[in-house]
Amino acid sequence: MPPSLPCRCQEAPTPVFGYLYQIVELGVMRLFVEKRVFNEIPDEGILIADLATKTGIEFNLLERLVNFLISSRIFTSSSPGYVHHTPTSKYFTERRAQLWYPHIFDTFLTSAVKWPEYFDINGMQEPQCSSKSPFGFGSGYSDKSVYEIFDLMPKRSSDFNATMALSMGEMPILGMYDFSWIGEYGKRPEVKDRTLFVDVSGGKGQALQAILEAFPSIIPEQCVLEDQEKVIEEAKLATGPLETVKKVPIDLFGEQPVKGALVYYIRRVLNDWSDAEVVQILRSIRDACAPDSKVLISENLLPDEPPLKLAAIDVWMLNFGGKRRNKGNFGALARRAGFELSSIAEDDKTKSAVLELVVA
């Protein structure tokens, strides 16, 4: 269980000073994560002078920054010149925190500092496409999507992929939707040549593998894994149930190459894109559908009155041109693309869901 975060902003003489305390803390924490300062503090504490030697940071600079974090109760001190961990600072020695915090900090603040200028140019409206996003504008690539930008930054791209891999377990694959009907349908002799399941933009097949293992009646040879060509090349090395799955490179916004499949499954993809782009993705699938095809969208759902965490994530995703969506949002986008929303299977704990679309 992560520790609660100490906050002294309520002690500020004015709200503006409260935000100043928070801004300074955010910046110092970002630097200390980058320089691995938290990892160099032993459980018994350390002299700031010795910590300066271990980290290679000038003593005068380190003392000022550490003193602030002692004042803000991120650190504690037994006597002047000493610094000790608290549960909060100790948490930032963990790999998960060291990946997530810089990712959130860098992508949000790079964007937010440019919000006034971005919205002056683009109007006070949601980003209309991922290649015209606040993050791209703030990063100096105003015509590129976040994925195109990360391709230009190998270290950031590597850190991003590692961060996303950590979050895979936060959104369940199984336990919401009953996939067993797909395997039962596949037992019919007349459909032995039909594609049963297409995992659209499915990465290396983690979700598809979990589904095939949980529902062994679904025949792998009648399944397809799709993603960008470079991802598919890696996926071809898979063993186990994925070994005999067809691997097909795609352009997510181009023509869907697999026609007439029983199910098109798209997980953790649509929330990364604007409404117009989601409609484009779904229409490309709609054009490939048979009359009885279904589309399964596995995504996080935004409640009509979202709690603070989900509302914050939604605003953060705005920077990339994406958004968290509620049931009504998905229903409206489905209709624009030529589908009807037929059912929703939800996980109340994680606010995840599988939305089933049928051809309208």
Curated annotation (Swiss-Prot):
An example Gene Ontology molecular-function term: O-methyltransferase activity
Enzyme category, top tier: transferase
UniProt keyword terms in alphabetical order: Methyltransferase, S-adenosyl-L-methionine, Transferase
Gene3D superfamilies the UniProt entry points to: Vaccinia Virus protein VP39 (3.40.50.150), Winged helix-like DNA-binding domain superfamily/Winged helix DNA-binding domain (1.10.10.10)
Record flagged with keyword S-adenosyl-L-methionine: yes
Source taxon at top rank: Eukaryota
Pathway: Secondary metabolite biosynthesis
Enzyme Commission number: 2.1.1.-
Residues bound to S-adenosyl-L-methionine: 201-202, 227, 251-252, 267-268
GO biological process: methylation; secondary metabolite biosynthetic process
Any matching Pfam family: Methyltransf_2
PANTHER family xref list: O-METHYLTRANSFERASE ELCB (PTHR43712:SF16), PUTATIVE (AFU_ORTHOLOGUE AFUA_4G14580)-RELATED (PTHR43712)
Family: Belongs to the class I-like SAM-binding methyltransferase superfamily. Cation-independent O-methyltransferase family.
UniProt function note: Methyltransferase; part of the gene cluster that mediates the biosynthesis of varicidin A, an antifungal natural product containing a cis-octahydrodecalin core. The PKS module of pvhA together with the enoylreductase pvhC catalyze the formation of the polyketide unit which is then conjugated to L-isoleucine by the condensation domain of the NRPS module. Activity of the Dieckmann cyclase domain (RED) of pvhA results in release of an acyclic tetramate. The cytochrome P450 monooxygenase pvhE then catalyzes the oxidation of the C21 methyl group to a to carboxylate group.
UniProt name for this protein: Methyltransferase pvhD
Lineage: Eukaryota, Fungi, Dikarya, Ascomycota, Pezizomycotina
